[in-house]
Amino acid sequence: MPRWILGDKFDTVFPHKGSLKVLWESRWKSACSKSVYPFHDGSIEDFEPIFNHLISKNINDAASDEYTQAFLPTASALEEKAAQALQAGKHEEASNLLCRAAVVYRISRFPYVDITKPSSIKRVAFERQKQAYLKATSLWTQPIREVTVPHTYRTGNDGAHIPIYIRTPAGADQSNPVPIVLIMTGLDGYRSDNSQRTHEILARGWAAVVAEIPGTADCPADPADPASPDRLWDSVLSYLDQRPELNTAKMVVWGLSAGGYYAIRAAHTHRDRLLGAIAHGPGCHYYLDPEWLAKVNDHEYPFEITAAWATKHGYKTVEEFVAGAQKKFSLVETGIVDQPSCRLLLLNGVDDGVVPIEDCLVLFEHGSPKEGRFYKGLPHMGYPNSLPVSYEWLEQVLASPSKTKN
């Protein structure tokens, strides 16, 4: 009997590994044509020529400068078209073009913006992505606003400021404060990659707040300190308390992929502040098992992932990460999940080869009772089946009585 629920797939090397041609033709082209992960807001007419170029030049390493550079002219051309549309008063067209430019930048800096390389070309692409995206969303009826939150609870190697996005529905004000969904982003998806989620959240009359997780993008929390996210959320929640149009007594968090780890942690450490938490495709313990880490680069994630994970957790080498991360960061090993928690919904595909489904199942053996929905035959995140369940659960939880603030 195999040790891992993933079964034979645990030892399988997926055919797209090391081949951008196979990745594009077998996985990404279809996702791009549907504008789904990781191509949200994108258009295949922008991407097909780029991937044809990369394939013709045999560029297969997404970590290379050549990979990123291949996307930049297309993104710049879209920004120029957007400027012309804006000058002509065509605001909706300009916004759509800028969103398309932003997602081209997003794929160019995929899969990870190395926080230890502030001058890298991927960082440049990320900065351009944010600029294009905020221009695009400023043209929406209900725009997304960037706010720089003071990290009032910071210690040690934490940075001083926390950039977040906030989007509120029409009618939100001091006399009508609205519930909050705080999105915790992932390893490769950052603040500017969540348009559709904010649309869905606002359509239900809630505010969307989007924040990045330690070791990624612009997050100032010390990636090497397992307790840094606790201070991060303390500062974010303290700021949100000061916004009169936001009802912080009716708040849930939604952690996506790597963000799911932080949703699980917050469900325990900040249980008195939250009505609930969704951990969507989360790791908590087994994803850091050396046996799992020895095989994860072979699985469904588009590129190698362990180097990014190592940097994200504050390690200088993959070897140090593999040797020490589970003992240091596991929410089981450190006893976090033995504490009481707020309501916690766990969602994933049973065939997840990025973080094992065991990381959801083990939580039912610890702490407060949990809720879960797992999808046989589906990979990481359990898409598309898991999304309707997410919104149904949020609707139920945010209709519950408010939390009493301390």
Curated annotation (Swiss-Prot):
Protein name per UniProt: Heptaketide hydrolyase ayg1
Species the sequence originates in: Aspergillus fumigatus (strain ATCC MYA-4609 / CBS 101355 / FGSC A1100 / Af293) (Neosartorya fumigata)
Pathway where this protein functions: Pigment biosynthesis; melanin biosynthesis
GO biological process: melanin biosynthetic process; pigment biosynthetic process; polyketide catabolic process
Subunit-level organization: Homodimer.
Effect of residue 352 to A: Results in a complete loss of enzyme activity
Family: Belongs to the AB hydrolase superfamily.
UniProt KW Hydrolase keyword: yes
Regulation: Serine protease inhibitors strongly inhibit activity. Moreover, 3,4-dichloroisocoumarinshows and 2-acetyl-1,3,6,8-tetrahydroxynaphthalene act also as a strong inhibitor.
Any one of the GO CC terms: endosome
Primary subcellular site in the record, as a coarse category: other
Enzyme class: hydrolase
Function: Heptaketide hydrolyase; part of the gene cluster that mediates the biosynthesis of dihydroxynaphthalene (DHN)-melanin, a bluish-green pigment and a structural component of the conidial wall. The first step of the pathway is the production of the heptaketide naphtopyrone YWA1 by the polyketide synthase alb1 though condensation of acetyl-CoA with malonyl-CoA. The naphtopyrone YWA1 is then converted to the pentaketide 1,3,6,8-tetrahydroxynaphthalene (1,3,6,8-THN) by the heptaketide hydrolyase ayp1 though chain-length shortening.
